[in-house]
Curated annotation (Swiss-Prot):
<dbReference type="InterPro" id="IPR000235">
    <property type="entry name" value="Ribosomal_uS7"/>
</dbReference>
<keyword id="KW-0150">Chloroplast</keyword>
<dbReference type="GO" id="GO:0006412">
    <property type="term" value="P:translation"/>
</dbReference>
<dbReference type="Pfam" id="PF00177">
    <property type="entry name" value="Ribosomal_S7"/>
</dbReference>
<dbReference type="GO" id="GO:0009507">
    <property type="term" value="C:chloroplast"/>
</dbReference>
<dbReference type="InterPro" id="IPR036823">
    <property type="entry name" value="Ribosomal_uS7_dom_sf"/>
</dbReference>
<dbReference type="GO" id="GO:0003735">
    <property type="term" value="F:structural constituent of ribosome"/>
</dbReference>
<keyword id="KW-0699">rRNA-binding</keyword>
<comment type="function">
    <text>One of the primary rRNA binding proteins, it binds directly to 16S rRNA where it nucleates assembly of the head domain of the 30S subunit.</text>
</comment>
<keyword id="KW-0687">Ribonucleoprotein</keyword>
<dbReference type="GO" id="GO:0015935">
    <property type="term" value="C:small ribosomal subunit"/>
</dbReference>
<comment type="similarity">
    <text>Belongs to the universal ribosomal protein uS7 family.</text>
</comment>
<keyword id="KW-0689">Ribosomal protein</keyword>
<comment type="subunit">
    <text>Part of the 30S ribosomal subunit.</text>
</comment>
<dbReference type="InterPro" id="IPR020606">
    <property type="entry name" value="Ribosomal_uS7_CS"/>
</dbReference>
<dbReference type="GO" id="GO:0019843">
    <property type="term" value="F:rRNA binding"/>
</dbReference>
<keyword id="KW-0934">Plastid</keyword>
Length: 155
């Protein structure tokens, strides 16, 4: 048994312009090489592009996209008796949001396009509508969990 206690969950601080935690979470995940100001620029440009494309509140589009991509269950590899099984596990809201943001950014980076702000805005709009690579990833994860339902008792 480990002697260490469990780490306290840190709550993300709100960003300076929109006062939104999701924006801060996105900024911290998009961050590369410690260039936080560049990460903020990318996010804010993407939010402006969403505003222009949809002509609605861009934060509601962001919230809707993240809610649409957030998985309920996932599979975890578990070694039982010499063979590895994919065991379906339920995911908490914080971990689900983190996964959703990671998938959205991954799908955005894979997209063809001019710059990251453009690609991110396109992916967020698609995810809010219920299409896009990130949504496909969520559905694939749910399918995997459903297929391996027989191993749920290994939790």
């Amino acid at each position: 048994m480990s002697r260490r206690g469990t780490a306290e969950e840190k709550t993300a601080k709100s960003d300076p312009i929109y006062r939104n935690r999701l924006v801060t979470m996105l900024v911290n995940r998009i961050l590369k090489h410690g260039k936080k100001s560049l990460a903020y620029q990318i996010i804010y440009r993407a939010v402006k592009k969403i505003q222009q494309k949809t002509e609605t509140n861009p934060l509601s589009v962001l919230r809707q996209a993240i809610r649409g991509v957030t998985p309920d269950i996932a599979v975890k590899a578990r070694r039982v008796g010499g063979s590895t099984h994919q065991v379906p596990i339920e995911i908490g809201s914080t971990q689900g949001k983190a996964l959703a943001i990671r998938w959205l950014l991954g799908a955005s980076r894979k997209r063809p396009g001019r710059n990251m702000a453009f690609k991110l805005s396109s992916e967020l709009v698609d995810a809010a509508k219920g299409s896009g690579d990130a949504i496909r990833k969520k559905e694939e994860t749910h399918r995997m969990a459903e297929a391996n339902r027989a191993f749920a008792h290994f939790r």
